[in-house]
């Protein structure tokens, strides 16, 4: 019996998404990038990552914001743009939901841990 070729992984798309978090990423456009129908793409994405495209992207944006809060002195507005949230209100909303602290409080806690 001939082997069925495996479907290509979404890894190249995930790498591209992680490098382009500041860009909008509608499911329709992401699906088109990998030559899939949006519903097929959404199912495949969940199968490979365990979550929806929107939740995965938001998680990556929060990770980026955390790193910027820990490693830079950038303001929350600048971090929001760099992480792909667009504005500080969106950053605060998503960050607080996922981390359990505001960006300002997180930075303060992180900096307090580093102090001698």
Task: For every predicted segment, state its role.
Residues 1-19, 28-34, 47-52, 59:
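Short, Lys/Arg-enriched, Trp-marked, Pro/Gly-tolerant hinge/linker segments that flank
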Residues 24-28, 47-88, 108-116:
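Terminal helix-turn-helix DNA-binding modules in bacterial transcription factors
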Residues 33, 82-83, 98:
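Residues within the alpha-helical elements of helix-turn-helix
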Residues 36, 85-86, 101:
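The short coil/loop that forms the "turn" connecting the two helices of the helix-turn-helix
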Residues 39, 88-89, 104:
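Key DNA-contact positions within bacterial/archaeal DNA-binding proteins
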Residues 41, 45, 90-91, 95:
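Short hydrophobic/aromatic patch on the recognition helix
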Residues 63, 75, 96, 101-102:
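Nucleic acid-binding interface residues in structured DNA/RNA-binding domains
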């Amino acid at each position: 019996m001939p082997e069925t070729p495996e479907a290509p992984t979404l890894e190249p798309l995930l790498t591209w998404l992680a490098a382009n978090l500041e860009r909008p990423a509608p499911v329709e456009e992401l699906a088109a990038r990998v030559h899939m129908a949006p519903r097929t793409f959404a199912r495949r994405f969940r199968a490979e990552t365990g979550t929806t495209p929107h939740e995965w992207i938001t998680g990556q944006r929060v990770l980026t914001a955390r790193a910027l809060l820990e490693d830079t002195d950038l303001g929350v507005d600048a971090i929001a743009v760099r992480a792909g949230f667009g504005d500080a209100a969106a950053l605060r909303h998503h960050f607080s939901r996922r981390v359990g602290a505001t960006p300002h409080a997180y930075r303060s806690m992180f900096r307090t841990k580093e102090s001698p």
